[in-house]
Amino acid sequence: MSRPVRFAALAAVLAAFAAAPAGADNAPSGACLGDPSANGVPMAPGPRLRFGITPAGEAGALGPAVPVVPDDPPRTLAALARLHPPKTPLVLRLNRFFWADGEAGIARFLALAKRYTDAGYLVELQVRYHPAAGQEGNVAGFVAFVREVVDRFGPNSRVVGLQITNEVNFTISPDSSDGAYTGARDALIAGVIAAKDETRRRGFRQLTVGFNWFYRTDPNSEAGFWGYLRDHGGPTFVAAVDWVGLDAYPGTVFPPVEAPGGERDGMVAAISQLRKCFMPIAGLGAGVPIHVEENGWPTGPSRAEDSQAQALETMVRAVHDFRGTYGVTDYRWFDLRDHNTSSTNFQHHYGLLRDDYSPKPAFETYRRLLDDLALRQPDAGLGPVRLALRLRYGRGWCAPVRATVTGADRPLVRRLDVSVGMRRLARIRRSPLAFTIRRRGLSPRHRYRLRVRATLAGGRATTLARRLRACAR
């Protein structure tokens, strides 16, 4: 729910939703609530969470249009750098990537992905169905768009996730959620299958594929949604799903109000209902991880900034504490910066920063939580580094050797440390990633190893090595 546009529309029906049981005819064993409270739920251990955030400030909202305060890229990167612990992967979730925007949208998101991955972050894309006039219901057209997204973004090894469609179970808010459009369920199924097929075919091993679920609508609608995935997706769909995303906003959307600290129960209820009640309907078992793709708490009129910090800490620690219990591997906060801090509509105040980039108390809270709880493997999920060391020997006796670093990850290289045997030769920090080695003085009696230590954006590193031929006598 990265766009709080749905809040007012939900207000009229939330009371009915809250009163109804969360299971339905297609639930595994009748009515299914999951775990409504954290009390008594075991906190099983699990790997540390991979954290992230939505860096954009734009948020849709019901009511009069309020202009978004434009993003300032250098200040955004500076804020992210303050938030980001060293040697820790931080995933930036880029939302509102609409099929309707065509090539212009692809170009814009390619530029955003490059900006953030060049700075050392991982990127995840929310690939929206959101059709233009004349596209609605054209599932084959959306599938072609999804395949193109894979082909265009997959070569960037730091683009690690594609969320196909957005909140298809939510059907009354076309700006925020794809469920309002004809063919959305089929677009989800076919899009996930196509995205996974294309990543496998192209060998983009780092690129995972998932879809998300909005917590929550009425139980009958939820059972119908998950039953549709089962009946129309089947084993092919299940095999293509790497993860299922959860969008949950306790104290803002559902439930619309929580007492301070009650957000812990809200997160447990949302995660457990997804894991225990709904994923099994579609055949998505315990081996499919859950990503908390969107979780937030806005400030604004009657919503204090200190309360945001408290809610953030409560919700993050709940996900951390029960990650092993429910198989949660990832967490994303929505979002970094306010849409417009001068707006009287609280829906424009989701950020950890105000629109002038000054921090709210929650910024420091999230920074501290990342430092305490985040996964410490900067290369987690990325697969092997795609670099190679090429040598070209010059003509003539004892001619120099030209060495070049090549490969798909070459744009991510930040430094090369070059050595021959025990002797350090050079440190290279700029393109071209090439250097010349003079072989005079290398004894033909010895074997020499050329080693190049490549350090990449984000802290990853690898060593490339080749045997170096000495000059013949």
Task: Cite the ranges covered by each PLM segment.
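Acidic (Asp/Glu)-rich catalytic clusters
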Residues: 43, 76-87, 107-123, 149-157, ...
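Hydrophobic faces of well-ordered beta-strands that scaffold small-molecule active sites
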Residues: 49-55, 90-94, 123-125, 160-164, ...
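Long, low-complexity serine/threonine/glycine- and acidic-rich segments characteristic of extracellular
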Residues: 387-395, 401-473
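Bacterial N-terminal signal peptides
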Residues: 8-19
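Active-site cleft segment of glycoside hydrolase catalytic domains centered on the general acid/base Glu
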Residues: 69, 73, 103-108, 131-272, ...
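Aromatic-rich peripheral "rim/lid" segments of glycoside hydrolase catalytic domains that contact
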Residues: 31-42, 65-77, 168, 302-307, ...
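Catalytic-core region of carbohydrate-active enzymes that cleave or remodel glycosidic bonds
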Residues: 267-329
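Boundary/entry segment of secreted carbohydrate-active catalytic domains
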Residues: 25-98
